[in-house]
Amino acid sequence: MEKTLSIIKPDAVKKGVIGKILDRFESNGLRIAAMKKVQLSKEQAENFYAVHKERPFFKDLVEFMISGPVVVSVLEGEGAVLKNRDLMGATNPKEAKAGTIRADFAESIDANAVHGSDSLENAKIEIEFFFKPNEIC
């Protein structure tokens, strides 16, 4: 069964919409195989988003991701990566389709409520970043 990583970002955690977002996953056929709430350190955020290190938004992204706790989940299901990305909506909430997580809960392109793996390969890497094998069930 395909797995993907989801992060509910600090803006959505602060708004108290964790349950609403998790319900979107479950009601659309994604099973929560692992989940934890964590406060990322600066080093963890920099390592997780290292692929963006040379991008102009990197510093702001890291600062945002350490501004409060996040909820990290492993989602499992048929076509989990694509299904999660469809549920999230466009990166910029202004461009996200009505009914998507970002259209409903995100504030801006920076505070955009959720992160989701963009490929099966990255999902594997991202899941291993946050979870040990025995934490996924």
UniProtKB/Swiss-Prot annotation:
GO terms for molecular function: ATP binding; metal ion binding; nucleoside diphosphate kinase activity. It is found in: Cytoplasm. The active site is at residue 115. GO terms for cellular component: cytoplasm. ATP binds at residues 9, 57, 85, 91, 102, 112. Major role in the synthesis of nucleoside triphosphates other than ATP. The ATP gamma phosphate is transferred to the NDP beta phosphate via a ping-pong mechanism, using a phosphorylated active-site intermediate. NCBIfam families: PRK00668.1. Belongs to the NDK family. This is Nucleoside diphosphate kinase.
